[in-house]
């Protein structure tokens, strides 16, 4: 009974301690209000933060934010995107927020500093079934936490419980076309697969992706094993309706364009008209394209007839087929032009890109290239992206750059210094 009471307390939605807004100057359509902000008693604290973040240098002057033209005073292009943090201007916060008729819709994203289970549970009513894509890279199930800013030395059962509790709530955040990516390594991929099968359903498993990781020099430690070079990312959807756009990658070698025989598709088909000549496909085969498509390809110069006997080529410039002018034999094969190819549809092997990055010297910082592929393959502009093991903030940063809305949850102090 005591344990049940503890569970009830743990699951009770928590109160928000405080909330602040970061709004760029160009979004505030009130010059008088901007002047109030820039003349505020706390503006020096805001400037100090800008300097620490590298947004302005030590020579910055408030008066440089405005300029005058024939229409009067306006924001300069150089400083119109300076971000105002309302934590420094609490007495002006309501006036700033009143500039937006629909504040929720105006916001690009939400950053939440909290233990993630409590955040997911508390804010669920606001975002239930509204998220399109979730990406998480939870703490790996390792023996030690020495190299990380967060705990990784969980027992298998504890680690499984930690993930299960959060994944169950996270599923409720996803809409019917939504999907989730969960990154893990060889220590825990078997646990993650079982959990995702149970929570999302085996029928909603989509892919087991592999991504590159940093290799450790195991030879120096005299460990008799191959260095781990890959991590796993499991992709699950909420239903058959899930949104997916095939990503492409550059081919290692460019494939030149070429003429290809049109009659190599299995299954007997009917004759088609080529340059006024009716041709039946080979026995047991059918012409690859419809008559409408064949006519279009002829008009575009992308279809020819080749004489099997002498190799004579008949194309659009020669009009209707009147027989082979070279050998007189009427034995033809239609061919169509296959364009050169520098890209190919990506498969589940994502080792062509780096899975980690060192931009911020943050342990296990996921690369922007990886997150770009994740987000573009499962969402569209203005869709909502979430990461509740945010770490260095790559997911929300890339979502923002790609024109998506975003939610990030992180509890560490790097929430302020890195995210």
Language model region names:
Residues 4-384, 415-416:
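Class I S-adenosyl-L-methionine
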Residues 143, 393, 397:
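Glycine-rich SAM-binding Motif I of class I
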Residues 172, 397-398:
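Hydrophobic/aromatic ligand-binding patch that stacks against planar heteroaromatic rings
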Residues 389-391:
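Class I SAM-dependent methyltransferase "Motif I" SAM/SAH-binding loop
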Residues 405-407:
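Short beta-strand element of Class I
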Residues 409-411:
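Conserved acidic E/D residue at the C-terminus of a beta-strand in Rossmann-like folds
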Residues 419:
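Conserved SAM-binding loop
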